[in-house]
Design a protein with these regions (language model features):
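Compositionally biased, low-complexity linear motifs
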Residues: 36, 164-165
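Conserved post-catalytic alpha-helical subdomain immediately downstream of the catalytic base
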Residues: 93-163, 170
Length: 170
């Protein structure tokens, strides 16, 4: 209710950006670019379909060097699958999918992904590791009440390494 719709203001903002981050529905709702063979409502979200979306966005916005999407599959309100993709100057990366069976709070999950991706891109030379960090960080956020991701880098890296035990070492 701010006077304009996202589709009216986002194209200009994205034209000045070198990275765009969204969820599985944003490109369609804001830019009219639909991932082929995807049904978000039915929980059918295929990572490779977003290669097409990233290609279309990069063709439309030459400033973009990186484009990333979170991919949520809804099994129920408290059980989701969670992954993400990253297109980086033509290369395409897919993160492992997490099965989050006891969601505490979804609020802040996208912010945690964005923060994790920015941290990952600045910290790790490998783009795959940067994406994996973002997905793991946001996965952990789903287990925390409130919109702040109160986890450490070590805890995120532990989950990235395959430790899904839920143990927190402090």
């Amino acid at each position: 209710k701010w006077g304009k719709k996202a589709a009216e203001v986002m194209p200009e903002l994205v034209s000045f950006s070198d990275i765009a981050i969204g969820n599985e529905e944003d490109a369609e709702k804001v830019f009219g670019i639909k991932a082929p063979d995807v049904n978000v409502t039915a929980g059918k979200v295929e990572a490779d379909a977003y290669r097409y979306v990233a290609g279309e966005l990069s063709a439309r916005f030459s400033s973009l060097r990186s484009i990333s999407f979170t991919l949520r599959g809804s099994v129920s309100a408290s059980h989701n699958t969670w992954s993400g993709v990253l297109w980086d100057q033509g290369a395409f990366y897919t993160a492992p999918q997490f099965d989050i069976t006891h969601i505490v709070d979804r609020v802040g999950g996208g912010d945690a992904f964005s923060a994790g991706l920015i941290y990952g891109l600045l910290t790790y030379p490998e783009k795959q590791k940067a994406l994996n960090f973002a997905v793991a960080a946001s996965c952990l956020k789903h287990t925390i009440s409130g919109d702040f991701n109160m986890v450490t880098v070590g805890e995120v890296e532990q989950l990235m390494a395959g430790d899904g035990s839920g143990r927190v070492s402090r």
